[in-house]
Amino acid sequence: MKKWQFVGTTALGATLLLGACGGGNGGSGNSDLKGEAKGDGSSTVAPIVEKLNEKWAQDHSDAKISAGQAGTGAGFQKFIAGDIDFADASRPIKDEEKQKLQDKNIKYKEFKIAQDGVTVAVNKENDFVDELDKQQLKAIYSGKAKTWKDVNSKWPDKKINAVSPNSSHGTYDFFENEVMNKEDIKAEKNADTNAIVSSVTKNKEGIGYFGYNFYVQNKDKLKEVKIKDENGKATEPTKKTIQDNSYALSRPLFIYVNEKALKDNKVMSEFIKFVLEDKGKAAEEGGYVAAPEKTYKSQLDDLKAFIDKNQKSDDKKSDDKKSEDKK
């Protein structure tokens, strides 16, 4: 029997701690591995970590992984402050975040754990919006297109109700870079992705964007919009188009890990090893898309090399100390 325990709640999100009562296969699992690794960040990545946690806890009842959902930006703030061991992110780390980590002498490793497609959706009753290009999306979310007729002269002269994640989310940053060219998003903003979905389902003129799995979970209530690429080809988000990047709003999902935690916290290093060995299966089970298998293999090889290198360094320091003591 598994038990989810909420260990903290804020306006930005909740932290989940997964424990297990008894091993998943009737055994106690790896009883030698004890401790905790703490993370926070993307609400898009959090469900993948939770799914991985379920599998992990079956054999690691005393090794806890906590995963918050404060948003990518907020997660990086905690990562920079040294409050957490890992940060979940739905976008690559920004240059200014890298600089802040460097200023604090914090080194990190980046792991790509899955792929996603930011999905644009409208109300189920919308019978005219089937596809959009990035310029049309930009017009909608910059506020320049106030009605559907402003987007396409053949569409109704009805006010658009555009909703967006707020700036604490990596999805917001991704959309800002890929669609808005860093022009301000002028739309109703919400920290809760489920609230964005709800807004679109309740408003006939609604439009919103979020991670692919949120669309999959609510596809009976939403209508996805195909996105045109630079050649004008309209493509819908599917596991195939997201993985091969033919969908115009495809993106990788990450876990960033403090190198010190990888070296000093066996729970952290073993969990990341477990994540990579899973090869995206947990992501697929949660409605996301696995990265190509070679991505997991190369990262796993790099992780093992990093751990081995540091183990040899620690062994050498231990041997040197013993030699000094003998003198």
From Swiss-Prot:
GO terms for cellular component: plasma membrane. It comes from the Bacteria. One of its GO terms (biological process) is phosphate ion transport. NCBIfam families: ptsS_2 (TIGR02136). A lipid is attached at C21 (N-palmitoyl cysteine). This is Phosphate-binding protein PstS. SUPFAM superfamilies: Periplasmic binding protein-like II. The complex is composed of two ATP-binding proteins (PstB), two transmembrane proteins (PstC and PstA) and a solute-binding protein (PstS).
